[in-house]
């Protein structure tokens, strides 16, 4: 038996395949999902999620969101996401620099909060590429 896993961002479906295991960056730490997992609905942090299927592990950087697990179906809704293998190292470094500049120049509390989230995502992308 396997999990029916879907990872969806506002602009695209990132993953829609079966898997044996999913590891997610939840608000309370890393969360592992296997078949027959209890029903669950929880918030996600920005970070790297991993999916294991018959061909091995796949890593996806996600920018926050939610996960719903029920009856071996895993629905992951994220604000943004991309495969780690598709991230260019030099572009990721530039994105961190740009996000840091935006964060440092933000003045209003809402601007600062949004800039902090984008900085966290840029840093997660860079770390994922460096660590792979």
UniProtKB/Swiss-Prot annotation:
Using the record for this protein, list the coiled-coil segments as residue ranges, or answer none: none
Cysteines engaged in disulfide bonds, as pairs? none
Native organism taxonomy: Eukaryota, Glaucocystophyceae, Cyanophoraceae, Cyanophora
List, alphabetically, the PANTHER family matched: ATP SYNTHASE DELTA/EPSILON CHAIN, ATP SYNTHASE EPSILON CHAIN, CHLOROPLASTIC
What is the protein name for this chain?
A: ATP synthase epsilon chain, cyanelle
Primary subcellular site in the record, as a coarse category:
plastid
- Stated role: Produces ATP from ADP in the presence of a proton gradient across the membrane.
Family per record: Belongs to the ATPase epsilon chain family.
Q: Which InterPro entries match?
A: ATP_synth_F1_dsu/esu, ATP_synth_F1_dsu/esu_N, ATPsynth_dsu/esu_N
Q: Which gene encodes it?
A: atpE
Pfam families found in the cross-reference section: ATP-synt_DE_N (PF02823)
> Which organism's genome codes for this protein?
Cyanophora paradoxa
Subunit annotation: F-type ATPases have 2 components, CF(1) - the catalytic core - and CF(0) - the membrane proton channel. CF(1) has five subunits: alpha(3), beta(3), gamma(1), delta(1), epsilon(1). CF(0) has three main subunits: a, b and c.
Q: Does the keyword Plastid apply?
A: yes
Which compartments is it annotated to reside in?
Answer: Plastid, Cyanelle thylakoid membrane
CDD domains given for it?
F1-ATPase_delta
Which topology term describes how it sits in the membrane? Peripheral membrane protein
Q: Which NCBIfam families match?
A: ATP_synt_epsi
Q: Name one GO cellular component term.
A: cyanelle thylakoid membrane
Asked if Plastid is a keyword of the record, the answer is: yes
A single GO molecular function term of this UniProt record: proton-transporting ATP synthase activity, rotational mechanism
Q: Which keywords accompany this UniProt record?
A: ATP synthesis, CF(1), Cyanelle, Hydrogen ion transport, Ion transport, Membrane, Plastid, Thylakoid, Transport
């Amino acid at each position: 038996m396997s999990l029916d896993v879907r990872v969806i961002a506002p602009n695209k479906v990132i993953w829609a395949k079966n898997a044996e295991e999913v590891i997610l960056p939840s608000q309370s730490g890393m969360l592992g999902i296997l078949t027959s997992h209890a029903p669950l609905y929880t918030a996600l942090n920005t970070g790297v999620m991993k999916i294991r299927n018959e061909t091995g592990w796949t890593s996806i950087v996600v920018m926050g969101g939610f996960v719903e697990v029920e009856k071996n179906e895993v629905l992951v809704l994220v604000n943004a996401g991309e495969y780690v293998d598709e991230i260019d190292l030099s572009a990721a470094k530039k994105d961190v620099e740009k996000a840091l500049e935006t964060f440092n120049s933000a003045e209003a509390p809402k601007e600062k909060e949004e800039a902090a989230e984008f900085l966290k995502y840029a840093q997660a992308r860079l770390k994922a590429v460096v660590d792979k």
